[in-house]
């Protein structure tokens, strides 16, 4: 019986990877339309740029570029959902981003790291911006730069 459950768990894990790949497919490949946004802001001594793609069914996917004070850039691909005025997205490492859309061009972003540390910040929101196929922000030399 233990072997059965182990095999079942292994099959579920192997089957989950293609599902995430399909969810992360570019909007043009799936035939669905996505709204794109760029969020920029600071948290502690780092700055971030988030490319976010929202589908009509409430799914979101995005890429977070976190630039530390020494210039190193870490990249995080996140997946989640939007409902009403709130959103939630997770990274495979256990990091979680939640928050709400504020009036105007701001979004409240709450970050919970996999180790439990929490941060809250307000990001500036740019709507209908070009992003890469995987929703990553374009290089900072493009038209939407962080202020």
Predicted regions and their residues:
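Bacterial N-terminal signal peptides
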Residues: 7-17
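Positively charged n-region of N-terminal signal peptides that target proteins for export
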Residues: 1-4
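Boundary at the C-terminal end of the N-terminal hydrophobic targeting segment
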Residues: 16, 21-26
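Central antiparallel beta-sheet cores of small beta-barrel/beta-sandwich binding domains
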Residues: 24-102, 108-146
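General helical structural elements
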Residues: 6-7, 129
């Amino acid at each position: 019986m233990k072997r059965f459950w182990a095999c079942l768990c292994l099959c579920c894990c192997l089957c989950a990877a293609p599902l995430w790949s399909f969810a992360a497919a570019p909007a043009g490949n799936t035939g669905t339309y996505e709204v794109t946004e760029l969020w920029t802001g600071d948290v502690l001594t780092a700055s971030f740029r988030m490319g976010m793609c929202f589908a009509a069914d409430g799914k979101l996917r995005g890429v977070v570029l976190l630039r530390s004070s020494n210039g190193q850039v870490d990249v995080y691909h996140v997946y989640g959902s939007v409902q009403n005025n709130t959103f939630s997205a997770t990274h495979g490492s256990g990091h979680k981003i939640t928050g709400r859309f504020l009036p105007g061009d701001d979004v409240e972003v709450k970050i919970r790291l996999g180790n439990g540390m929490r941060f809250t910040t307000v990001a500036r929101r740019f709507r209908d911006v070009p992003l890469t196929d995987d929703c990553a922000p374009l290089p900072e030399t493009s038209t939407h730069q962080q202020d």
